A protein has these predicted regions:
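Short acidic catalytic loops
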Residues: 2-16
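Conserved H-loop
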Residues: 46-49
């Protein structure tokens, strides 16, 4: 059987564009997906596009989503992902994200600097909502993922501290 469903891309249905409250269709649809997940004991993953005007924002949070409050309300976990800008991997740039890996030494975790290959394809993942731990806004930490688009593989390689602000 199945234990995970990926719904790509979660958005307002065309038939709902005539309504003055398009956000209600997102709430309704998210609740239907939630019911299905609970009924069949499924992990339900739904991708949602970031609002276009948020392109260039470095530190992502739920405000990047249209209808953010309604969308976030129903979710158990919310992860936000974006492309990594070249400036974020350049140590001389004011946007450098300071990638690191955790290494255990004498029962203590220390941060070990990580040099990200600037020629690789990278994505940055922000934990916006979790019911079981800290989120990126609490810690200032996001995850650096190496992306292999040919095989749709994301590998968690390091953590980082993205800057707040925008790149245009």
């Amino acid at each position: 059987g199945y234990d995970t469903v990926l719904y790509d891309t979660f958005k307002i249905q065309e038939s709902d564009f005539s309504s003055s409250r398009q956000d209600l269709s997102l709430v309704r649809d998210s609740r239907e997906l939630d019911k299905l997940a609970k009924k069949y004991n499924l992990i339900m993953l739904a991708s949602v596009q970031l609002a276009e005007y948020m392109k260039g924002k470095l530190f992502l949070d739920a405000s990047c989503l249209s209808n953010a409050k309604q969308t976030k309300e129903i979710l158990e976990n919310l992860f936000l992902m974006r492309t990594v800008y070249a400036e974020e991997l350049d140590e001389k740039s004011k946007y450098y994200c300071h990638p690191f890996r955790l290494k255990k030494i004498n029962d203590k975790w220390i941060e070990e600097e990580y040099k990200a290959d600037p020629n690789a394809v990278w994505r940055m993942l922000f934990v916006e909502k979790t019911r079981n731990g800290n989120n990126s806004s609490d810690t200032g930490i996001a995850y650096l993922l190496k992306f292999s688009g040919d095989h749709s593989i994301f590998r968690e390689v390091a953590q980082c501290r993205p800057k707040h602000g925008e790149i245009r």
